[in-house]
């Protein structure tokens, strides 16, 4: 449970927006997480959450509306491995992530529906202090809105970057 006072939201026409007090909001929810080590070096992780986040009676403009950018639910599942080799450990990972519906505005007019992404990575623990991994996030290039606002009578949205491919390197000096 979380109670927030003096929550602030952007309001006004595009280009002249200001922060304004949106009142109080309450959030209640539950999160669950489990891990199953089904074979040596391999695990299956699963997690989920359900959240109800609304503006309270104290909010004159948004009473009873859902708080922007708070998905109603989320879930994830991944298979993770550690494969020891003479050249260091290889760490494959495959994950699916589900994000529930949420709004971008206090009026609850601009909504992003539920979407899911599939992510993968392969890490290499070359030494105790060096790790290199390659990843592909959003493998199937699922498009969804990350932000939205009203511009006059038109709704405008920013779309995610789509599939992302990258390399992470970590070196611990101490």
Model-derived features with residue positions:
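Structural signature of outer-membrane beta-barrel channels/translocons
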Residues: 35-43, 80-86, 123-125, 129, ...
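Flexible, surface-exposed loop regions and adjacent strand-edge segments
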Residues: 11-18, 60-66, 109-114, 148-157
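Gram-negative outer-membrane beta-barrel transporters
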Residues: 1-4, 14, 20-106
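Short beta-strands and strand-coil junctions in structured, solvent-facing domains, enriched
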Residues: 5-6, 142
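Transmembrane beta-barrel architecture of outer membranes
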Residues: 17, 27-29, 72-76, 115-119, ...
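C-terminal beta-signal and adjacent terminal beta-strands/loops
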Residues: 97-105, 124-174
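Hydrophobic, well-ordered secondary-structure elements that form the walls
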Residues: 32, 46, 79, 94, ...
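Short, glycine/charged-rich beta-strand-loop motifs at protein surfaces that mediate ligand recognition
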Residues: 106-111, 119-123
């Amino acid at each position: 449970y979380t109670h927030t006072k003096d929550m602030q939201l952007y309001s006004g026409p595009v280009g002249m927006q200001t922060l304004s007090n949106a009142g109080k909001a309450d959030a209640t929810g539950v999160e669950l997480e489990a891990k199953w080590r089904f074979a040596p070096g391999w695990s299956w992780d699963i997690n989920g959450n359900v959240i109800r986040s609304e503006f309270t009676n104290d909010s004159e403009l948004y009473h009873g509306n859902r708080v922007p950018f708070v998905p109603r639910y989320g879930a994830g599942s991944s298979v993770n491995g550690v494969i020891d080799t003479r050249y260091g450990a290889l760490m494959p990972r495959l994950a699916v992530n589900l994000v529930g519906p949420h709004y971008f505005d206090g009026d609850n007019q601009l909504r992003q529906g539920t979407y899911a992404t599939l992510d993968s990575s392969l890490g290499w623990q070359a030494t105790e202090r060096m790790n290199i991994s390659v990843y592909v996030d959003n493998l199937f290039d699922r498009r969804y809105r990350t932000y939205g606002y009203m511009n006059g009578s038109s709704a405008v949205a920013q779309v995610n970057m789509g599939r992302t491919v990258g390399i992470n390197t970590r070196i611990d000096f101490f």
